[in-house]
Swiss-Prot record:
Subunit: Component of the cytochrome c oxidase (complex IV, CIV), a multisubunit enzyme composed of 14 subunits. The complex is composed of a catalytic core of 3 subunits MT-CO1, MT-CO2 and MT-CO3, encoded in the mitochondrial DNA, and 11 supernumerary subunits COX4I, COX5A, COX5B, COX6A, COX6B, COX6C, COX7A, COX7B, COX7C, COX8 and NDUFA4, which are encoded in the nuclear genome.
Chief place where the protein resides: mitochondrion
Reactions catalysed according to its record: 4 Fe(II)-[cytochrome c] + O2 + 8 H(+)(in) = 4 Fe(III)-[cytochrome c] + 2 H2O + 4 H(+)(out)
GO CC list: mitochondrial inner membrane; respiratory chain complex IV
EC number: 7.1.1.9
Entry's Gene Ontology BP terms: ATP synthesis coupled electron transport
Localization (cell): Mitochondrion inner membrane
GO molecular function: copper ion binding; cytochrome-c oxidase activity
Family listed: Belongs to the cytochrome c oxidase subunit 2 family.
Name of the protein in question: Cytochrome c oxidase subunit 2
Length: 227
C-alpha cells in the first residue's frame, strides 16, 4: 500500500502491475535522455562563440531529427501495446465478481457463491478503530484469494464511476448500461486499498475500495466474508 511522503509507485501485487512498473521505468529513462540532450544542445547554443550564416539547409541533421524521434516512439509504443493486450486477456478465471458503482458506495456480488450480494460503504470517522485508515477503510471488505485468476465485471447504476486498485494495476470504468470486465491474479496476501477514480459527484472522494487477499487454501475452505 502507499506510505506517507511516498514518491514512487506502490509495490506490485500482480503481474500486470509489475509490467507497468517496468514500463514506467523504461519510459522515464527515455524522457531523461531526451531532456539531457535538449539541455545539452541549449547549453552549447548559449555558450558557443561560433557563428555561421551561410548554411541554407542541413539534410543530414533533418534526417536525424526525423528518424530518431520515430525510433523513440516505437521503443515506447511496442511495450505499451504489449501491456495493453495483456490487460484485455481473460484466461479461464477461477472466480467472477460483479462490482456495481453507486453514489457513493460499491455493491459486490459473488456470482460463484449463490449470488451473495453486499454493499461496501466508507467507515465514518466515528466508527474507526485504532489502526484503521481515515477515508480508506470500509465496513465490508471484498475478500478474494491469491494465486487465482479473478474476473471483475464492473458496471454502474447511476453515473460514471471507475473501479481502481493501484497496487494491482487495475482501473476499469463503471458505465451505466454497460458491463466492463478486467482480470487479475494477486500474488501476495494482504489488505489493499483503492478509490473511485472518476469524478462522480459531491462525495466522489468517499467511496473507497478495500480488497482483503487471503491464501487460496483458506478461501477454498469456505468464503470468508467480513459482513
Amino acid at each position: 500500500m502507499a506510505h506517507a511522503a511516498q514518491v514512487g509507485l506502490q509495490d506490485a501485487t500482480s503481474p500486470i502491475m509489475e509490467e507497468l512498473i517496468i514500463f514506467h521505468d523504461h519510459a522515464l529513462m527515455i524522457i531523461f535522455l531526451i531532456c539531457f540532450l535538449v539541455l545539452y544542445a541549449l547549453f552549447l547554443t548559449l555558450t558557443t562563440k561560433l557563428t555561421n550564416t551561410s548554411i541554407s539547409d542541413a539534410q543530414e541533421m533533418e534526417t536525424v531529427w526525423t528518424i530518431l524521434p520515430a525510433i523513440i516512439l516505437v521503443l515506447i509504443a511496442l511495450p505499451s501495446l504489449r501491456i495493453l493486450y495483456m490487460t484485455d486477456e481473460v484466461n479461464d478465471p477461477s472466480f467472477t465478481i460483479k462490482s456495481i458503482g453507486h453514489q457513493w458506495y460499491w455493491t459486490y456480488e459473488y456470482t460463484d457463491y449463490g449470488g451473495l450480494i453486499f454493499n461496501s460503504y466508507m467507515l465514518p470517522p466515528l466508527f474507526l478503530e485504532p489502526g484503521d485508515l481515515r477515508l480508506l477503510d470500509v465496513d465490508n471488505r471484498l475478500v478474494l484469494p491469491v494465486e487465482a485468476p479473478v474476473r471483475m465485471m464492473i458496471t454502474s447504476q447511476d453515473v460514471l464511476h471507475s473501479w481502481a486498485v493501484p497496487t494491482l494495476g487495475l482501473k476499469t470504468d463503471a458505465i451505466p448500461g454497460r458491463l466492463n470486465q478486467t482480470t487479475f491474479t494477486a500474488t501476495r496476501p494482504g489488505v489493499y486499498y483503492g478509490q473511485c477514480s472518476e469524478i462522480c459527484g459531491a462525495n466522489h472522494s468517499f467511496m473507497p475500495i478495500v480488497l482483503e487477499l487471503i491464501p487460496l487454501k483458506i478461501f477454498e475452505m469456505g468464503p470468508v466474508f467480513t459482513l
